[in-house]
Amino acid sequence: MDIKEYSKLIKAKRKELDDLMKRKMPVIAGRMAKDHFQDNFRREGFVNGGLHPWPKAKRLSSGRTDAAGQYGTLLSGRNHLFSSVKYVPADYRVRVADDLMYAPLHNWGGEVHPTVTPQMRRFAWAKYYQASGKAKKAATGKKKGKKKGSAASNEPQENPEALKWKRLALTKKKKLRIRIPQRQFIGESKELSDKITKKTENEIRNILNL
């Protein structure tokens, strides 16, 4: 096929090619991007020129045996962050995003300074009992002292996860300073760009019967 024949073929297929780039590829590329970014959660790292592993969540090394201790970093029983990755196709383009309020904080890292409220303390106590495996004791109105040498004074040390929640429940601070490490899951990715380029080229070849 010489250049004139190729130019004639392009003109004949112009409508199909335009429909591909305007309508079909934004949907195809969006789906590919969503799958790629969600796979970052499963791999626990960001893929761009290779896998860049995330810092491990502290709960994974806390010795917890409950369900929460088994989920990977940034994953949970509800998977809000994972499930909120979405794509919105438009003419000749597609927007891929995670619109959860705290998504940018995890994606880029940073600090938050939440106010310590009574609700937060109650939540911390609930998480403490969950992480420690202890049953919440009913209030009796009486305080019992620990006798020296008693079984109570020889209780095993609490695991780091439970201790973290206990400290939060008992803190005297009015505001907290919490640093969130970067765990990028959305952004420019060489591997994703290469896959989309290859898919686009294949779709064009199919239209031109090349």
Where are these regions (language model features)?
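Short, Lys/Arg-rich flexible segments
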Residues: 1-210
